[in-house]
Curated annotation (Swiss-Prot):
One of its GO terms (cellular component) is plasma membrane. Its main location: membrane. Pfam families: K_trans (PF02705), K_trans_C (PF22776). Belongs to the HAK/KUP transporter (TC 2.A.72) family. The gene is kup2. This is Probable potassium transport system protein Kup 2. Transport of potassium into the cell. Likely operates as a K(+):H(+) symporter.
Length: 633
């Protein structure tokens, strides 16, 4: 009796937890794609409004939207990519890390694919908040046209408040994200259901033949409107990127039970409304609702777009942390805003970069119609990159043959390339903005990676082999350095070479500690490393120990905490009797270098932007000794 009751209680708790994950996924994962109905159909109709929209065009466009959602979101992301995880983590960099683990790090195609995908995502993280919030506030123009001039400043004010709040964390309000977004999807579904009966011909859009027929007869205009049709799936990358936060089943359940049906009903309702009232093509989303409901819907839409923006910002923070740990960016200051959830982080430099970009976009474009033309390129580009990485995943991880992997993904790849081509037609109309943003970010990441590789090669060639140094220093002679009590830890990224900071300490202080640790921190190509694989201790001589500490690319690189695990490995030391020796690099430009002059200057600027290793690795500040060294590049 008691056992049965306990089992039932556990089942209820398990179901409650699962429902909570589903609701949370709706708020975070689907916030972006859930705001697309605000503008997607309106923008797709725009090329046809001058001559009046016709049944063939409305049904064809809605059919394209339905099947774009079905093929790209349902088949590619929900059913396939959510299974292509790296120990439960998803996203472009996570998939890249898994492939590097399987195929090696020195695969240029993989490396540049990861850089491009990451850069495109950051560009998308600037455009999404600006476009979605302006689209929501523009519903106020239907209440009174006088609101039109206030949309940009109101949007900017909301963005400033949102970005300013990031440093305090979102834990206090995130519990409301899911319920508010659920309400938003119900409101969208209700708006669609009310109007589908306006013209039942819209149900013909369910037949994919109508989508193909539209493309066959629309000619060049058909390719142009594909760029707007693609707006229906912006935000799909979030499904994959947030896999680690919610898990595969809750994300899939949320899509099939609420999100997908609500989107289909809303788009069908917008189409039926325009078929029955062609003038509604000016703003079909908000015109679906009666006058008395317009203000509440605008307010709910604004909340939904703020939540969608928050999800994109959080994703950008997470991507930046992964990029830092994988060596694509310099050490950035990362603050944890929750004591219990390590996924809730704040990256001040990324926050400032995004806010600056968002405000520039709001005031440069002025309205969502203009900004929508710039949208899509970054998203389609990121999706094409993900499909390319997924092809390698099928071959390297799942063992598919080239022909089988091609058969699985080539049709999808062709569809996405067509969408990318359609979006590239908008380059002159503002599409250059996300391209320029992505190129700038990619250049920074490539320069940092190339510069770090060059410095490591330089050190490997110029520094003394560690084993030779230890043999010479352990020989007893009249010139041997004085031995002092305690432990000295020397951080280095090239563990088989003698750290310069160790040589400088000997040269200037003429002492050697009783215990000397050559410490190297490694980032593995997996999200998390368990404690039993965290450290590796190698005794090199009576006074020298090599210590390797391994972190995953989603781990907090807390070296002090990791050192506490050394006791379990038989290596004992007292933290208050330990000194951490760090080398502070001062880069000096030289004529002969492995980097072009422009890249040298960028790399030196990035080097100056990086935070101190003592802060990044959470070393006790009162136990850190820094010695300067000049490095010629």
């Amino acid at each position: 009796m008691t056992s049965t009751h306990a089992d039932k209680t556990g089942d209820v708790a398990s179901r409650t937890g699962f429902v909570g994950l589903v609701v949370g996924a709706i708020g975070v994962v689907y916030g972006d794609i859930g705001t697309s109905p605000l503008y997607a159909f309106r923008e797709a109709l725009r090329p046809f409004t001058a001559d009046g929209v016709h049944e063939f065009e409305v049904i064809g466009l809605i059919s394209l939207m339905i099947w774009t959602l079905t093929i790209i979101v349902t088949f590619k992301y929900v059913l396939f990519l959510l299974r292509a995880d790296n120990d439960g983590e998803g996203g472009t960099l996570s998939l890249l890390a898994l492939l590097m683990k399987k195929m090696g790090r020195n695969v240029p195609v993989l490396f540049f694919a990861g850089l491009i995908g990451s850069a495109l995502f950051i560009g998308d993280a600037m455009i999404t908040p600006a476009l979605s919030v302006m689209s929501a506030l523009e519903g106020l123009k239907l209440i009174t046209p006088a609101f039109a001039e206030y949309v940009p400043p109101l949007s900017a004010a909301i963005m400033i408040v949102l970005f300013a709040a990031q440093s305090r964390g979102t834990a206090a309000v995130s519990m409301f994200f899911g319920p508010i977004t659920v309400l938003w999807f119900f409101a969208m579904a209700a708006g669609g259901v009310i109007h589908i009966g306006d013209d039942w011909r819209i149900l013909a859009a369910i037949n994919p033949i109508n989508a193909l027929s539209f493309l066959a007869h629309a000619g060049t205009v058909g390719l142009i409107v594909l760029g707007a049709v693609f707006l229906t799936v912006t935000g799909a990358e979030a499904l994959y990127a947030d896999l680690g936060h919610f898990g595969r089943r809750p994300i899939q359940m949320a899509w099939f039970v609420l999100v997908f049906p609500a989107l289909l009903l809303n788009y069908l309702g917008q189409g039926a409304l325009v078929l029955s009232q062609p003038a509604a093509s000016a703003d079909p989303f908000f015109l679906m609702y009666p006058d008395w409901a317009l203000l509440p819907v605008v307010l709910l839409a604004t909340l939904a777009t703020i939540i969608a923006s928050q999800a994109v910002i959080t994703g950008a923070f997470s991507l930046a942390r992964q990029a830092v740990h994988l060596g694509f960016l310099p050490r950035l200051r990362i603050k944890f805003t929750s004591e219990t959830n390590t996924g809730q982080i704040y990256v001040p430099s990324v926050n400032l970069l995004l806010l600056t970009g968002v405000l520039m976009l709001i005031f440069s474009f002025g309205d969502s119609e203009s900004l929508a033309t710039a949208y899509g390129i970054s998203v389609t580009g990121a999706m094409v990159i993900t499909t390319m990485l997924a092809f390698q995943f099928l071959r390297a991880v799942w063992g598919y043959s080239f022909m089988l992997a091609s058969a699985a993904l080539l049709p999808l790849f062709v569809i996405e390339v067509v969408f990318l081509a359609a979006n590239l037609l908008k380059i002159q109309d503002g599409g250059w903005v996300p391209v320029a943003l992505a190129l700038a970010i990619m250049t920074l990441m490539w320069t940092w990676t190339r510069g770090q590789t060059y410095l490591k090669k330089l050190r490997a060639n110029n520094e003394i082999p560690l084993d030779s140094f230890i043999r010479s220093i352990e020989r007893k002679s009249d010139h041997s350095p004085v031995t002092v009590p305690g432990t000295a830890v020397f951080l280095t990224s090239v563990p088989d070479r003698t750290p310069n900071v160790l040589l400088h300490n000997l040269k200037h202080n003429h002492v050697l500690h009783e215990q000397n640790v050559i410490l190297t921190v490694w980032t593995e190509d997996e999200p998390y490393v368990p404690d039993n694989r965290r450290i590796k201790i190698s005794q090199l001589s009576p006074r020298f120990v090599r210590l390797d500490i391994n972190f995953g690319f989603m781990d907090d690189p807390d070296v002090t905490r990791a050192l506490a695990l050394c006791r379990e490995g038989g290596f004992k030391f007292e933290i208050m009797k330990t000194s951490f020796y760090l080398g502070r690099r001062n880069l000096v430009r030289t004529p002969n270098t492995g980097l072009p002059g422009w890249q040298e200057r960028i790399f030196m600027a990035l080097e100056g932007f990086a935070i101190d290793p003592s802060d990044y690795f959470n070393l006790p500040s009162n136990r850190v000794v820094e010695l300067g060294e000049q490095v010629a590049i």
